[in-house]
């Protein structure tokens, strides 16, 4: 059986045999279908690129029907249990699990680059009195590139690597700066002897001049959440990273663009929306009425459903377990029972089952963050810190891909036909 698709253009009666590779046909082959030589050629219309593969990638694999997520072939369940964020970041970048020597060298490099340039603090001082941390983080990533003018040499592998290390290493400090700026507090430098996640907690929570020692369970929980959020195929922010990067922009500009995409409430703000929903529902006895209102179209069950996953999000199962470990330390979030009852009903109710609405990674993560003392406006920042690793792995893959061209989609024009300008006096 040939791996081809035969199309007949009923406008002309001509048939075309299009090759199928990796369950896809090339848009360029569709473009060859035309009525006459002067015709532009056939286009595909795909708003939001729902069924369009814009690249080939070796980084993340998702099977939405089976609820599978893998980084570089490794199941997310194994990485969350056995690995660490910094090891996963290196895996995403290099494609293989590192040796102990390789991991130690990587950690040393991250350590050496973890403090942003001193003058970057002045940027935060120039912002509004209480800027949203995501807005401040976007500005910081964009400004960071001005301190490293070599960054525009994106075709130099050594230069690329230095910028990748700097961005991943400095993301926690920039995020902590943004949070402390909103609270009107001075910045706290990183401390020695703490993990990547632990140092972020120190820079965020410490009193100036004093060391903050994170609880090991909470430190590990945050690291696991960083692993779960490190990459997720071609989502909105990753596509923004690739799209801006395709113009040969430096990685700082591309990361700023990706962070801006993540700032959108339809992308990075989902766990915040879940928490607000749970606060709105309130007590356990109000769950049935809320479910009824959702089924009537009067509200939305936040944290359920996903563009890709049509079964249980594998990350959600891990987050649920992490939540139990965190609550054993912090005490149970009073909204946990409400969340569990919403999940129980939704997994049994035909309305949600038939629509394949299952819990996603955001359903329980907001409860964890709240229990750990993070303000709601930091939730998306906690998404952005680890996602820098995925963004940069995707960016470098794009830079090295010989098929890469500057992103330039087509449109279907629906505006006015040609018309003559009318002078103001004649309108």
Language-model segments: residues:
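Non-transmembrane, aqueous-exposed alpha-helical and coiled segments at domain scale
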Residues: 1-427
């Amino acid at each position: 059986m040939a791996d081809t698709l035969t199309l007949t253009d009923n406008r002309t009666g001509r048939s075309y045999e299009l090759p199928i590779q990796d369950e896809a046909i090339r848009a360029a082959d569709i473009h060859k279908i035309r009525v006459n030589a002067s015709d532009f050629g056939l286009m595909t219309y795909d708003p939001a690129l729902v069924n369009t593969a814009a690249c080939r990638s070796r980084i993340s694999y998702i099977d939405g029907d089976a609820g599978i997520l893998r980084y570089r072939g490794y199941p997310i369940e194994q990485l969350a249990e056995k690995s660490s964020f910094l090891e996963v970041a290196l895996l995403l970048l290099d494609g293989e699990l590192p040796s102990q020597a390789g991991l130690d060298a990587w950690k040393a490099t991250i350590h050496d680059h973890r403090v942003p340039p001193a003058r970057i603090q002045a940027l935060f001082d120039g912002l509004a009195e209480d800027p949203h941390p995501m807005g401040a983080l976007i500005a910081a990533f964009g400004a960071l590139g001005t301190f490293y003018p070599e960054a525009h040499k994106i075709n130099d592998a050594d230069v690329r690597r230095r910028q990748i290390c700097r961005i991943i290493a400095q993301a926690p400090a920039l995020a902590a700066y943004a949070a402390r700026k909103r609270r009107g507090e001075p910045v706290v430098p990183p401390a020695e002897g703490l993990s990547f996640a632990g140092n972020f907690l120190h820079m965020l929570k410490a009193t100036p001049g004093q060391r903050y020692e994170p609880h090991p369970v909470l430190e590990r929980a945050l690291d696991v959440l960083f692993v779960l959020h490190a990459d997720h195929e071609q989502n909105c922010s990753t596509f923004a990273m690739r799209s801006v990067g395709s113009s040969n922009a430096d990685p700082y500009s591309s990361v700023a663009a990706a962070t801006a995409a993540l700032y959108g409430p339809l992308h990075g703000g989902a766990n915040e929306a879940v928490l607000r929903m749970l606060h709105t529902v309130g007590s356990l006895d109000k769950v049935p009425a809320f479910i009824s209102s959702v089924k009537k179209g009067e509200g939305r069950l936040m944290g359920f459903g996903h563009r890709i996953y049509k079964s249980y999000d594998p990350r959600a199962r891990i987050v649920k377990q992490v939540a139990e470990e965190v609550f054993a330390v912090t005490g149970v979030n009073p909204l946990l029972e409400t969340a569990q009852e919403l999940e129980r009903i939704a997994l049994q109710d035909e309305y949600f089952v038939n629509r394949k609405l299952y819990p996603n990674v955001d359903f329980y993560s907001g409860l964890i963050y709240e229990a750990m003392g993070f303000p709601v406006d930091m939730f998306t920042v906690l998404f952005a810190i680890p996602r820098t690793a995925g963004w940069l792995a995707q960016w470098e893959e794009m830079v090295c891909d010989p098929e890469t061209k500057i992103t330039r989609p087509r449109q279907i024009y629906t505006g006015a036909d040609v018309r003559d300008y009318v002078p103001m006096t004649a309108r």
